[in-house]
Regions:
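Membrane-embedded transmembrane alpha-helical bundles that form the catalytic cores
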Residues: 1-246
């Protein structure tokens, strides 16, 4: 569903109307439902990858934060049991190593999934070229995987969240569905931008009342964006495409 399509305009109009008609406590769950529905409209199985990415970073973030709090509590309550500052330092280093290992493992899992979808056939193509160059008849079959829409955006947004938790810039989100909304929020799911949790979360989760001035301001920004896309960018694309043909 392209942002410039009539289907998307109809979708956003209905979503906007319902968002301000439902009880305000249900606004963020409503955003989650329509975001998942929006993504599923591109491919019924696509939300599975979105859920996996969200679950990995959600669970890893919770464990990292909980482990750090438990470590601090243990040190505070058992400060006298450490024989020296060096022993206390080594204890903290062991805890930090466990948290770092989990964080790196989560990063590698998500990057591996992204890499398989984006670069598996590229790697296979180069390996086949090497086989051909050395005179081998061996040829690997292409995977022909269909790249899930927006997987790069939500993968890096999920990883950004996890890194912020690890660096103690934010608290881990305790509600999985709120975390899922942050990862899957439909206006940025396909074309970005990649947002920081600290910048977006409060706006997503808080209750909103209809504000005419804000709505007009939002419509002005949308129309300006459409102008830049349909009039400026598409015109330049047509001109450059024609130029590059010659």
């Amino acid at each position: 569903m392209l942002f410039t399509s009539y289907a998307f305009i109809a979708f956003i109009a209905v979503a906007f109307f319902l968002y301000y008609r439902i009880p305000r406590k249900w606004q963020w769950p409503f955003l989650l439902i329509i975001s998942i529905g929006f993504y599923a409209s591109a491919g019924i199985f696509y939300p599975i990858f979105l859920l996996v990415s969200s679950a990995v970073t959600y669970l890893a973030g919770l464990w990292i934060e909980r482990n750090r709090k438990q470590e601090k509590t243990y040190i505070r309550e058992n400060a006298g049991q450490f024989a020296s500052r060096q022993e206390k330092k080594e204890f903290k280093q062991k805890g930090e190593k466990r948290r770092r290992n989990l964080m790196v493992s989560a990063l590698l899992i998500l990057l591996a999934v992204l890499g398989v979808f984006k670069y598996a056939d590229f790697v296979i193509d180069n390996m086949n070229a090497v086989f051909y160059a050395v005179g081998s008849d061996r040829e690997l079959e292409y995977l022909d995987l269909l790249l899930p829409m927006g997987i790069s955006f939500y993968t890096f947004q999920s990883l950004g969240y996890l890194l912020d938790v690890y660096w103690e810039k934010i608290d881990a989100q305790k509600n999985f569905f709120k975390h899922l909304l942050f990862v899957s929020f439909f206006p940025q799911l396909v074309q970005g931008p990649i947002s920081r949790y600290s910048d977006l979360s409060q706006t997503l989760y808080e209750e909103h009342v209809f504000d005419k001035k804000q709505v007009i301001f939002g419509l002005e920004r949308i129309l300006w964006g459409y102008f830049k896309k349909l009039v400026v960018a598409d015109t330049i694309l047509t001109a450059t495409t024609s130029f590059l043909k010659y």
